[in-house]
Amino acid sequence: MPVIAAKILVGFVVGVLIGMTGVGGGVLMLPVLIFGLGYSPIVAVGSDALFQFFTKIPAGLLHLKNGTVRRKVVLALALGSIPGSFAGVKLLIYIRLLYGNGVNTFIKLAVGVLLIVIPTMLLLQKNIEERIANRAPTMKGFAGMAVIGLTVGFIVGLTSVGSGSIIMMLLLLFYSFPPKINVGTDVVHAVVLFGVTGWLQFRAGNVDPRLVVALLIGSIPGGLLGSHLATRVPMLWLRRMLCVLLLITGARMLWPA
């Protein structure tokens, strides 16, 4: 199969899985780029960040139109996540300057940890939602949201992973927003965060523009198909199987054979 066709196919398959399960693009895309297409982890991270920026724009606009976005929350998160992302990308540049290709080992370890943590969170999400339903928020104000943004921005700057899963879980735990508002607010914030992160990664030379274009060509129809199939397949079991696969992938990154 020609290389360009393989990249488009990867974008299509990941788009279908995202559309069907709602599992974030970073945790699905990065392992395929690294293990499947053979990209260095640092280029995979940078390219994935820019890819996610473009893929989240349509959903963000739709949520704004539907009124499912807390704009003040987006602002508070962004006040933390933008400097956090800047710090994360700068740390990658610094590690590469000191250790050369050792930065790729560092990224694999960081992504491996996230591929253990995030699927575990997703598997437990339903139980957590049921336990805290109708509970009063345990945190209030911009400061707490900005800290959440700072933490997630730093992680995304390092790995391009975790924007959706981690922010949604933290908003759920500490602010008790309705799920629909959580999703809309997270998606619009992700547009801002990945826009900044993608630009920083591009400036650092960590983006393969041709890869990003090929992935987008495949992911757009893939996402539409996945959304169409979401009501026609046993999504709960598919999501669980996907989480188990991600856990195995994370273990492989942490403990390679």
Walk through the language-model features, giving the residues of each:
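Juxtamembrane transmembrane-helix boundary motif
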Residues: 1-10, 35, 65-152, 203-257
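Transmembrane alpha-helix interface/packing and boundary motifs in multi-pass membrane proteins
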Residues: 11-22, 150-160
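Alpha-helical transmembrane segments of multipass membrane proteins
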Residues: 15-16, 32, 36, 60-61, ...
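Transmembrane helix boundary and interhelical junction motifs in multipass membrane proteins
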Residues: 22-30, 159-168
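Juxtamembrane transmembrane-helix termini in multi-pass membrane transport proteins
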Residues: 24-74
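Interfacial segments of multi-pass membrane proteins
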Residues: 29-43, 166-181
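Transmembrane helix-bundle signature of multi-pass membrane transporters/permeases
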Residues: 45-53, 78-82, 186-191, 219-220, ...
